[in-house]
UniProtKB/Swiss-Prot annotation:
Component of the cytochrome b6-f complex, which mediates electron transfer between photosystem II (PSII) and photosystem I (PSI), cyclic electron flow around PSI, and state transitions. The 4 large subunits of the cytochrome b6-f complex are cytochrome b6, subunit IV (17 kDa polypeptide, PetD), cytochrome f and the Rieske protein, while the 4 small subunits are PetG, PetL, PetM and PetN. The complex functions as a dimer. This is Cytochrome b6-f complex subunit 4. One of its GO terms (cellular component) is plasma membrane-derived thylakoid membrane. Pfam families: Cytochrom_B_C (PF00032). The gene is petD. Belongs to the cytochrome b family. PetD subfamily.
């Protein structure tokens, strides 16, 4: 049994749409009832089973009790705040750091308008969005890794 319906390439309307680069949603199984009644419950039950299984097999360990009089040498935020922490740590002017962080969502809001002429959903046929995504991912990883290092090695990772 296959989850995808093969397109009927003898259909002239479908061939015309595919020749224009359109028609990628023209064929396939309908969402109702196939996805909503059969696939979604399996995914939901599987997710719940995975969470319960991981909770049973590897329960969270309770750490040492907090000591308010013994602070660590370097206090780091949670891992998902490391890139933002690195921006605020490296940029000399804190207002400039906040402006840099606020410009990221504003820049991401511009990507659909830049690519509004592009009708393709394939990421290989959308070079601007793909380049923005890959550059943003690389910069985020670079900032996140750099936040865990001392300030003098944080931008170069100590390689230079």
């Amino acid at each position: 049994m296959s989850t995808l319906k093969k397109p009927d390439l003898s259909d002239p309307q479908l061939r015309a749409k595919l020749a224009k680069g359109m028609g990628h949603n023209y064929y396939g199984e309908p969402a109702w009832p196939n996805d909503l009644l059969y696939i979604f419950p399996v995914v939901i039950v599987g997710t719940i089973a995975l969470c319960v299984g991981l909770a049973v097999l590897d329960p969270a360990m309770i750490g040492e009790p907090a000591d308010p009089f013994a602070t660590p040498l370097e206090i780091l935020p949670e891992w998902y705040f490391w890139p933002v922490f690195q921006i605020l740590r490296v940029v000399p002017n804190k207002l400039l750091g906040i402006v840099a962080m606020a410009s990221i969502p504003l820049g991401l809001m511009l990507v659909p308008f830049i690519e509004s002429v592009n009708k393709f959903q394939n990421p290989f046929r959308r070079p601007v969005a793909t380049a923005v995504f890959l550059f943003g991912t690389a910069v985020t990883l670079w900032l996140g890794i750099g936040a865990t290092l001392p300030i003098d090695k944080s931008l170069t990772f100590g390689l230079f």
